[in-house]
C-alpha cells in the first residue's frame, strides 16, 4: 500500500466533491460562467501533435515547494482540480471554470479570495490496443513508477503567485511550457545489477512492447565461486529505482538532517543511510547466507506495481514474472531454479504479493514472509465488508451517516476517511486512472467494464458497492476465501510456508483481514497450516514481526530478518538430492 500523507497532524477532515468532469477544452462556445477561469495550454515546442491526458490545476498557500508535490491524503494537502482532455492541440486552451471538481475543495468556485501559489500539469496518456479488443487511453510508465507529478514527458508550468477573486470575471492563463526530463538508468556496482527484458506475454496483451525489470543483489563471493548456484529471495514491494536500502560506502556524517513526520524522528535520513550501509556490511560479512536477492520492477499503466498476478485489466503479469523474468534471472546469475530454493517476502503491497504468489504458484516457492499485507480477506477490505455492506463510505444506517475511517494513528485518531481518499483519486483520474492505491486494487481484481476500463467495485462519488463485482473479486483474488475453498488441494502445498505479521494498530486497518485469515488457519486440519501469525502491540503500518525494535528501524531490516530463515526452511523442506552445498562457503 502506498502512503499519500505529508503530515502527521491528526485532525479529522470533511470533504464533498462533485463527479469528475468531462473535457472542457473547447476553445469556443457559449459564454463561461462569471468568475475566474483558468486557461491552460502547451506550446508547439512541447508537442506539435495533439495530446490526450488528465489536466491538473493546483492551488497552494505554501510556496516552499511546487504545488505538484503538495497533494496528499494528509492534513497539509493543498488543492487540485482535474479534467480529461482529448486531442488537445498546441496553443489550444483547455478551460477550467468554477464548476470543475477538486480535492479537497468541492469546486474551483469555492476558492476564497486570496493570493495563491499556482501550477498546471498535464499527465499525458497514450492509446493501447489490447488483445481483448478494447482500446484504452492510459499513462504509460516512463521509469518513474507511475508518479504523475514526476513522470518524464509530462508538461507543466513554473509555479507563480496568482490573485484569485471569485467576484472577478477573468481568464487566468497558464502556459505548460516545461517538460519533465527522462530519468537516468541506475548505476551498477560489483553487487547490484539491473535486468530488463521485453515480455512476450505482456506485449501480446497490451499490443505494444512491454518490459519487466529487476534489481539483483549478488552474494559475496559470486565471482570467486563460478560453480556455485544460489537460492533466490524475491523481495516484493513498490516500484524500485534500484535495489533499495543498500549502500556500499559509509554515510556522510555531515549530511543535513531530514525530520520524519511519519515516525517523529529527527535525522531519519541518517538512520536510513546507516541501515543501508549495515546491510552491505552484513551481506558481505562472514556467516550471511549466500543468495540472490531481487526486487522486481513491474509498473503497469495503472500503477507502480502489477501486484504480481494475472489480471483481466493489467494482463498476465503473474505468468510473465514467473515464466519469463525469474527464469531469465536464474539462468544469467546461476540460480538453482527450483521451487525449494525460492522464497518471497515483503510488506504492505509486497506482503499481499508474497502471499498471493505463494498461493497461486505454490510449487514455485518454499515460503512466504508476509508483513502488513494489503487486504487478504475482502470481508475486511480495510473497514468494508464487500459482501454485506451497501456503502463503502458510510456505515449502513437508516438515520445516521457515520463516515468510515481510512487512516488512523496508533492511538486510533482518524485523519482521513475512505471517502476523502477515494475522492482525491477521482480528481487525479477518471475511469480508475489515478495511478493510486484504491484504483490499482480495482484494476487488479475487477473484470473489464464495457468501456475497456476496470469495472468499479463501488461508485467513486457515492460509495455504493457493486455486489456483482464483489463476487468476481471473491472468486479470483480474495486470498482468505481461496484458502478456505481450496484447502483440500492447496493446503498440502502450503504447509509451513505462510508467515504473517501485522501491527494491531495498522494505519489502514489491515490487521482486520489478518484476524479472519488467522481464524481459518488455526482451525485447519489435514494438514494443519503449521505457519505463523503474529501481531505487534500498538504497532502501525508496516510492522514486520520484530518485537525488539521500533517500526521505524525494523522496516529497514527485512533482508537481515528473513533471509536467514529461508535457510532454515531449505533444511526442513527440500527434495531428494538438493543443491545445499555449492552456495555455502
Task: Identify the residue ranges that each predicted region occupies.
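Bacterial N-terminal signal peptides
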Residues: 7-18
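Non-catalytic cap/lid and distal C-terminal segments of serine-dependent acyl enzymes
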Residues: 45, 60-103, 107-585
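General helical structural elements
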Residues: 6-8, 28, 419, 427-428
